[in-house]
Amino acid sequence: MTPIHRIVCPIDFSPASANAMRVAIDYARAFKAEIHAVHAYQLSAYASPNSDLARDLEEQIRKEVEAFLATIETFGVPVKMALRLGVPYIEIVEAARELNAELVVMGTTGKTGIQHLLLGSVAERVVRTADVPVLSVRYVEPKS
């Protein structure tokens, strides 16, 4: 079995990504690995990457990522944060490559039909293009 030292866990502040982070923490504890929480985002067509708007947005996103991660018990597992500007699935795959991660753990909601056709699936694209194994963790909404 290939040892796992680094796990990339993409986050988008959704319950599905929180669920995936908990699974990534379980794997990290078992393998004594570190987690890189990656949030990839795109700018609007009206903002250049070097504009004040882009810098303000990055700072706002950084705070949101920190707040999101603060809600998840890590059990002492090191979690590093990375913000990536660009097409989400490409940035996730590139982050895994650059970090020499051995595993990507990401949430999915299992959308199908029109919703899947219109929005696509970041998880599906990561699975298709990543150089390392991708564990897709399906999130099922609790019934009320």
Cite the ranges covered by each PLM segment.
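General small-molecule cofactor/ligand-binding pocket signal
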Residues: 38, 80-84, 135
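Short beta->alpha linker loops
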Residues: 41, 60, 83-87, 109
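Structural beta-alpha unit
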Residues: 2, 23, 70-104, 142-144
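Small/aliphatic-rich secondary-structure junction motif
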Residues: 2-51, 55
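Short, surface-exposed alpha-helical segments at coil->helix boundaries
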Residues: 54-66
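Short glycine/serine/threonine/alanine-rich loop segments
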Residues: 27, 31-34, 77, 101, ...
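Intrinsically disordered or low-complexity boundary/linker segments at protein termini
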Residues: 1-19, 75, 128-144
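Gly/Ser-rich helix-loop-strand patches that form or flank binding pockets
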Residues: 95-144
